[in-house]
Regions:
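Acidic/His-rich structured neighborhood in mature extracellular/periplasmic domains
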Residues: 2-139
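Flexible, glycine-rich surface segments
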Residues: 90-195
Length: 195
């Protein structure tokens, strides 16, 4: 409901129509379908309409070194270092870059380390620009997926079919977490199936 609204769908169609050639080129080069690339850009920044208003240096410095730094201070310190390196490598003024309240940058909302590892010049102008170049944004999102193991035509989702006696495995996996708690083999050994 939050992301799939008529307004967002309409913006996505406009973005898709305006960038068809680039999306097809990225799909051909990286194997990532256009609709996946479109969805990421739409969710992350509403196709570039919300890239952030916070000074990224100030944000990362506060989150890593400030009085209110939290449990993720080391993560943000590493991102601050990556941000400064990214600015030097791309000849950007760190005082002028703006992003999200968490330091995410540009239309794809890459954190600084992701920018350095996955952002690419996809329009051939020798500049990586994730704010103003839809070509670079599209190529970078596709590159991110490819470098993180995306396989063309590989299944990305399926239904899980289980009997009530095995409900505990599904309930355990459904609790909020960043990493799976139950292996595929455990599911299969307990008569849980995918369609």
């Amino acid at each position: 409901k939050l992301f799939v609204t008529k307004k967002n769908i309409d913006k996505g169609i406009i973005f898709w129509n305006q960038n068809k050639k680039t999306l097809l080129r990225a799909e051909k080069k990286f194997g990532v379908p256009s609709e996946i690339i479109i969805a990421i850009i739409g969710i992350e920044s509403k196709y570039g309409s919300r890239t952030g208003t916070f000074k990224t240096f100030d944000t990362l410095a506060s989150l890593s070194l400030g009085a209110n730094k939290g449990r993720r201070a080391k993560f943000y310190k590493d991102e601050l270092i990556n941000f400064l390196l990214m600015c030097r490598e791309n000849k950007l003024d760190p005082r002028k870059i703006k992003g999200s309240y968490a330091g995410a940058l540009g239309k794809p909302q890459f954190i600084s380390s992701s920018y350095r590892h996955y952002a690419i010049d996809f329009n051939g102008d020798n500049v990586v620009d994730l704010w103003n170049s839809n070509e670079d944004v599209i190529g970078s999102v596709a590159n991110y997926f490819k470098k993180n193991g995306w396989k063309k035509n590989q299944l990305i989702m399926s239904n899980l079919i289980y009997e009530n006696s095995n409900k505990k495995y599904v309930e355990n996996e459904s609790k909020k977490t960043y990493k799976p708690k139950t292996s595929y083999e455990t599911f299969m050994n307990n008569e849980l199936y995918t369609d």
